[in-house]
């Protein structure tokens, strides 16, 4: 009888465990993307300015345009002044009633003194939303000791993918804390969700972004500030090699619009429903299945990248 009760208890626990995870998966997919209406971002932000890094291309540029469309003044930060000037012009052509400022900064520069100068400029305005988007990618997947560009490239990826989100958050948070309102969105990557061979540094730095965001959320839980980590999969951007758009690979405008709608409804999410479906499926797969798929994808990616760099046709 005791054995029978034990077996029944174990069986019930297993069923409850499976049911819990099934419900969690369904909620992760449907709540932010189907059930909930977008929140009033201006009310939650508590201020009219949005700062976006890496704002002249891809996801960052689309975040800038979408925030401007929603009535925020935008402060765009990137490396190239000519691209910043053009982006400012393009935003104002579509949204002439807002204000756009820009600051040039090369985020491979880890100088604290230079960061303080940048933060001094940013703190001239009341920042309600900070989008830490700037990031860097290797040319192609490779083993750590064979990475193209050596330790210089490795250092740059680590610096760009970790320092800006950390230091800019630290520098902007004081004004958010004093207002008891604000939103900080850190853009990570699908690569931070699982351990990726031959993308070790990129994957690890994106995991840092996700982990940092979660820690800050706990740290400032009583200050009225929203912290969100976005972990997108493939988006049709220059950084991703400009792939064709599809259900699973949206353009950056579609992605940014979707991701902004999840603020206040999901603390950690991919930002796009198709990516969330991919993410939930991926988490269910055993490592050997993921590793085999990644290995095949890496080989194809590397072959294409090397062929392009050498300007030779693929075999």
UniProtKB/Swiss-Prot annotation:
Pfam families on file: adh_short
Gene Ontology molecular function terms on file: oxidoreductase activity
E.C. numbers: 1.1.1.-
The UniProt record lists the keyword Zinc: no
Record bears the keyword Cytoplasm: no
Binding site for NADP(+): 47-76
GO CC terms, sorted: endoplasmic reticulum
Active site per UniProt: 202
Protein keywords: Lipid biosynthesis, Lipid metabolism, NADP, Oxidoreductase, Steroid biosynthesis
UniProt record, GO biological process: fatty acid elongation; steroid biosynthetic process
Recorded family membership: Belongs to the short-chain dehydrogenases/reductases (SDR) family. 17-beta-HSD 3 subfamily.
Protein name: Putative steroid dehydrogenase 2
Organism listed in the record: Caenorhabditis elegans
